[in-house]
Amino acid sequence: HIAYTAVAGTLTVGSSDAQDAQLGLDGKPEPGSELALSEPKEPKDAPATARMFYVAYFKKDAKAEERPITFFYNGGPGSSTVWLHMGSLGPKHVMTGSDQHLPAAPYKLVDNAYSLLDVSDLVFIDMPGTGFGRIMGKDAEKSFWGVDEDANAFARFIARFITKYSRWNSPKYIFGESYGTTRSAVLANVLENDHSVDINGVILLSQIFNFTTDIDAPRENPGVDLPYELALPTYAATAWYHKKLPQQPTALEPFLKEVEDFSMGPYAHALALGTDVSDTEKQQVAQKLHDYIGLPVDYLLKANLRVSGGQFEKTLQDDQDLTTGRLDTRFSGPSLNPLSETAEYDPQSSAISSAYVSLFNDYVRKDLKYGEGQTYLPEALFGTFQWDLVHHGNPIDLNVANDLANAMKTNPKLKVMVNGGYYDLATPFYAAEYEEKHLPISAALAKNIQFSWYESGHMVYVRDESLKQLHDRVAAFIHDTQADSK
């Protein structure tokens, strides 16, 4: 057992660098600053600020310059970090068991045998407008709810945090999940180039950089067939898990390699031909797809060889009237509407959400003594929530690959670790590999990227065996990157 101190609190950040520089660590304008002198009478007319909530865990009696610190955040966009905090590498862990829906409360919170505190201090940060954090002032939502605005807020938060706790000279890591990986690509670049904070390692979990690879809505973008090719190995893993294949291979990983080769070869070729594909080739590819993902040949031909995530989730276990999960395809639940073409809800989200939110609310008040009389928002209030996907002034589909590439070029020692689940259809693992292997960097720099896959879903840590692997592999990554930087 590792002795640690837990601190829950908030730090206030500004919505521009100029304004942020004039805010003290208490979040108030520094006396005599331009900001203090021009303070409006009404708080709603003041420049926007975000009070960001965090929980930090520090190992007792550790030397700051020798002790790594890792900043964690979930995605959404619009999500608090309750999921990573209560499920992954923090000192406490929500017991969720297997791939089944949990019964209602009481739920069980236990000490986490796989906490990362053995190698790093941990900071779990809630994005602006979630958790116990609040955004306020003029145009507050526009000032924080967007790709660039959000990354800037996190960079300002981290700069303030390492000032408050004297951690400028500690090895630093950022750990984002899902949209949090999108944030990390932008954030690593902003920290390095705007705040002079070099990061030792970027740890990505369930990555999405390029939003045109999304398998949820590929039909909106005809002619872009990449999403189908990158999701195919996840379809195959899912069919394998649910034993829906005509011939069931014994081992998963060699089977997935075979599917990847097919996906980038004969499958990609047939899709690229569009309406020029011959009947013979189409029939052959449909037959092979049937062998790999278990859906009927006639269904695959009707779908023109292109099956969206929602269609796959609805169709794979249709004979049992079950809908397959999206975030974790090992989960299944009763279909809401048997005649629906696509899945109408996600069995995994509905299976575990209540346990996480209930236990966090209990833990933060009883153990951390924080939040009395306040409401904890697991997500931004979605009635008013709108996210601005414009990045660097570019309104077309979001792709943050250039940001990470730039961070790696300007800090060639930066190491990147990509983690993902074979059973994740929200951000398929093969898409993450494809994105990383297409970063505009040299082959030498690409050696700084490593991949780690797990027999789990989007939140790989809900499966105990995967959580243990995640801990061991992330711990090894932190050790190795420190050895490299000495």
Regions found by a protein language model. Give the residues of each.
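A catalytic-pocket lid/entrance helix-loop region that shapes and gates access to the active site
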Residues: G90-G97, A188-I293
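N-terminal cap/lid subdomain of alpha/beta-hydrolase-fold enzymes
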Residues: Q19-W145, K437
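Catalytic histidine-centered segment of alpha/beta-hydrolase-like enzymes
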Residues: E455-S466
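Alpha/beta-hydrolase fold catalytic core
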Residues: A270-A426
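Alpha/beta-hydrolase fold nucleophile elbow
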Residues: R167-Y179
